[in-house]
Amino acid sequence: MKNILRILISCAVLISGLFPQVLAQTVVDSELTLNEISHIQLGDETFDLNATLLLEWKTEASQDSDSESKVVERLTGKELVETLNNLWYPQVAIGNRASKRESEDYILIIRDDGTHQLIERFNVTISLHPEIATYPFGNLDLFVSLHAAHKEIDQLILNPTKFELRDGSASEIIRGNWSFSGERTIGNLFYSLTNDDTELFSMNEFHFIMHHDFSDGFFKIILPVFLIILLSLLLNNFSSLAFAANADWRIGGQLTLLLTVLALKFSLESELPQTHYLNFSDAMFIVVLVVTIFNLVVGILINNLYQKQGDVIARPIEKILETVVPLFAVALISLAFYLTFI
């Protein structure tokens, strides 16, 4: 039933475009300019956005003209508020916002051909979907979902015409360890306030692809994890428990490394994506935890063997583990790469 309803509405939209006299429908062109993208928090699943939205429409009394239209009025402040109270204008909402949209500035431009341009600069915190399986590497799809707020789709259509970065410079508007990778716009979407799709509103999505910087992920996650694994293996292989004095160094060192892993994971909590699947950062933390815990337990057991059974039994087992444990660590790291990148 829902699919049939969507098909009928799509047909209505097409008919209204071919025969505007059939349906009293207003087409509103939408342009979005990104001014600043900041505080991309994968753990909280939000990011902050400062953007400029331009909505353009024509009144029923307007007529097409080949000549360039001239600005009749340019309204701001109190005069703009009074005009909007007595004038119909398209009201839009951001469907994936996580906080209230705060407007910095409003401008209404009216031209002599009946064209109206409403420009709004605003700040908003937007929800994101942290779908980035290869984190701390890879791309993240951020988007702004813009939909009509009061007029249903048979009365108002949002038509995305332009999507750009301010001044065309990604380095100037992106804050944090991310870079701009591309953008796309999706129109002809429907937004429903109810589950039965009885009320449908026109919706556009403005997507911008962000790439996580390699150096940030390498120095914050990959390098510390590999160093902890390496130190854990070195403690095992070069602190033989055949010498009683090494017991404190080896067991205490493994315990310190284990606590370091937990502290690192906790400190990066807001930056790590919370996904329903195993991403690369999760896999690497699991690997380093398994290796350090395994080496800690092995150290305790081998030390106990030396104390109770002596060198005859403990030393051969320790020598075998000096070879097996590094191979085990390499196998776990390879598995982590395979599960996330292949």
Enumerate the language-model features and the residues they cover.
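Bacterial Sec-dependent signal peptides at the C-terminal "C-region" and cleavage site
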Residues: 16-26
